[in-house]
């Protein structure tokens, strides 16, 4: 049945194919790793991921379907700002941004880092273009019962004039962050509309 070294030849050929397959797989993995490294070192801050678009639209009170999120999100203008002593300066990317401002259909949303219950997170706050009302707010990276209370509130003198329990550090942090976003968005809004 296995005359003239058929089995030996078959095994030799199989071994050669395995070596070639493993070698080509290693080189393709190296190529993929190189591409991932290049892509991760150059984040495209001009595009917003769909998850962030959801947070922004929720803060703005924009009703949309998940299916339409990406196409609607292409119309959101995004601006990144650093801040020092209450003065905001435009920066080119999300890295080191203290405030990110989204503008869509004459409504603003601000995003800023926040620490809630010891967790680092981001808060999104939607603000009407006349800076008289907070539309809604939400968190990314933490959960808090406070989020439901910071919506449909009036703004006066660039801040919310509400009181929170002084013993509740999360409530104080939340209010400070919301007021920081309101003040920041109002200060930089002339730069966005010109």
Swiss-Prot record:
Key words of the record: Cell outer membrane, Lipoprotein, Membrane, Palmitate, Signal
Keyword Signal set for record: yes
Annotated membrane topology: Lipid-anchor
Lipidation (S-diacylglycerol cysteine): 22
GO cellular component: cell outer membrane
Endpoints of the signal sequence: 1-21
Localisation: Cell outer membrane
Keyword Ubl conjugation: no
Lipidated sites in chain (N-palmitoyl cysteine): 22
Protein name: Outer surface 22 kDa lipoprotein
Organism encoding this protein: Borreliella burgdorferi (strain N40)
